[in-house]
């Protein structure tokens, strides 16, 4: 009898595939403000979060609340930041989109007012305010996509810290392995044709080839359901 495929092992669950969420620091959300309220705080610490590829900062606000938020470039321990409708336009401050001028770089943008932040949260990314059109604010996302958002949605001024992270090469396979292990991702992924026949339907043989049709039915049982599943077309370009 053959061995289980990687997808079957992942479905069963094991320490190899278990999420590392027990080490995550917190959900990063904007502090709640009401009406014209503006809350000021001071950065007390820069924190590493295994859940993210950018640094985060611990902020103690004037109302006594302490919160972890995304760190934009140019802020550090001891700096003051503010969250509210009358906050100054400077890196680290959080305002409604309606109060941010056109052409300004922003990050950690809310999708709906009060959701805490949904867009432009990865290291080194930012979005740009394109225009204010009536009841909508036009924002260009890091991907280049244009979104029209509620002007009451809040965003943080500046670029997310940690830019250039992807420019540093791993150099060694071991470094890549530790990176993927931290994300509960099994790596490297071996091709089916490179396996033994006991490990994969495409394995075995004197040379690397599937040895059978790659198209399989949608109703194929687990363990044999590999390749082009319920493919409408196959061949070059499909």
UniProtKB/Swiss-Prot annotation:
GO MF term set: rRNA binding; structural constituent of ribosome
Matching NCBIfam families: PRK09612.1
Biological classification of the source: Archaea, Methanobacteriati, Methanobacteriota, Stenosarchaea group, Methanomicrobia
GO cellular component: cytosolic large ribosomal subunit
Assigned keywords, A-Z: Ribonucleoprotein, Ribosomal protein, RNA-binding, rRNA-binding
Coiled-coil region list: none
Main function: One of the primary rRNA binding proteins. Required for association of the 30S and 50S subunits to form the 70S ribosome, for tRNA binding and peptide bond formation. It has been suggested to have peptidyltransferase activity; this is somewhat controversial. Makes several contacts with the 16S rRNA in the 70S ribosome.
Pfam family, one: Ribosomal_L2
Subunit structure: Part of the 50S ribosomal subunit. Forms a bridge to the 30S subunit in the 70S ribosome.
UniProt-recorded name of the protein: Large ribosomal subunit protein uL2
Gene Ontology BP term (one): cytoplasmic translation
Stretches the record annotates as Disordered: 201-238
Family: Belongs to the universal ribosomal protein uL2 family.
Native source organism of the sequence: Methanocella arvoryzae (strain DSM 22066 / NBRC 105507 / MRE50)
